[in-house]
């Protein structure tokens, strides 16, 4: 991985292909240049407060944007001493996660962890759990926050960057506050924007250095805003 990282950082014409998750269509290979990877890295580091002392556990596929670009590659560029990449196992996850500060889970993985025997009495204090790839329900967010975790609901796409809009949720009171403001049939996207954005006929458009193409990208996602400029997701166009 160290040699792989140096190629990304030092070679102008080098790039890597990331497999899209397939949530918005057929999975495809997305090519990212070194400059694009740097942009994704910078946002991931700042948005998640990653430092050289962070300890990252990756349990998602590293050929996908979520598995590689959200935490794993940023942690390597920071020189983190503890970075482990493992195949996801819901039963083992709770036993191991206490030694880490950051991880990323899909909603399906979060549900699987919730169903394990150990979840009822687990303590996730001091752990930032990034949740995304698909919308994360309030029920799931509340379950993990009630165990002490900071849940960072994250929205991104393979084409526009892994971490584009998100929100940190660390208390039941915050959840109740947000639930009261969530429009019917919508789920939370976030209130922290790491891109330029606009809404045209209810569809979200974004633009940033993390996008694989210049200019405005039509996401195909139908969204809404509340008075506090928090964004919510309804579904695909």
Locations of regions flagged by a protein language model:
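Conserved AMP-binding/adenylation subdomain of ANL enzymes
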Residues: 39-55, 63-102
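Conserved pre-ATP/AMP-binding loop-to-beta segment of ANL
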Residues: 2-19, 49-55
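Gly/Ser/Thr-rich phosphate-binding loop
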Residues: 102-105, 114-182
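Short beta-strand->loop structural element characteristic of the AMP-binding/adenylate-forming
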Residues: 1-6, 28-31, 80-88
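Conserved AMP-binding A3 loop
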Residues: 15-42
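Conserved ATP-binding/catalytic segment of the ANL
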Residues: 187, 198-199, 203-237
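Active-site glycine-centered loops adjacent to acidic/histidine catalytic or metal-binding residues
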Residues: 23, 133, 156, 221, ...
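Short Gly/Pro-enriched turn/cap motifs at secondary-structure boundaries
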Residues: 184-191
